[in-house]
Amino acid sequence: MAGKKGSSPNVYAYFKVDGDKVSRIKKVCSRCGKGTYMSEHKDRNTCGKCGLTEFKQ
């Protein structure tokens, strides 16, 4: 069994639950499609799978 006892899963970093509604927090990669999320940096969003980089304005 991996991880520390009592640690929360990373899935909570990707979704937000408001009552009965679930919404995505992180941006989905436009090249890879659903299921691939982009990491957030200070000045850009980057996909770890395909390497797509979108710079923030």
From Swiss-Prot:
Part of the 30S ribosomal subunit. Keywords: Metal-binding, Ribonucleoprotein, Ribosomal protein, Zinc, Zinc-finger. A zinc finger (C4-type) spans 29-50. SMART domains: Ribosomal_S27 (SM01402). The lineage of its organism: Archaea, Nitrososphaerota, Nitrososphaeria, Nitrosopumilales, Nitrosopumilaceae. Zn(2+) binds at residues 29, 32, 47, 50. It comes from the Archaea. GO terms for biological process: translation. Pfam families: Ribosomal_S27. Belongs to the eukaryotic ribosomal protein eS31 family. GO terms for cellular component: ribonucleoprotein complex; ribosome. The keyword Zinc-finger applies. HAMAP family: Ribosomal_eS31. Its cofactor is Zn(2+). This is Small ribosomal subunit protein eS31. Binds 1 zinc ion per subunit. The keyword Nucleotide-binding does not apply. The gene is rps27ae. GO terms for molecular function: structural constituent of ribosome; zinc ion binding.
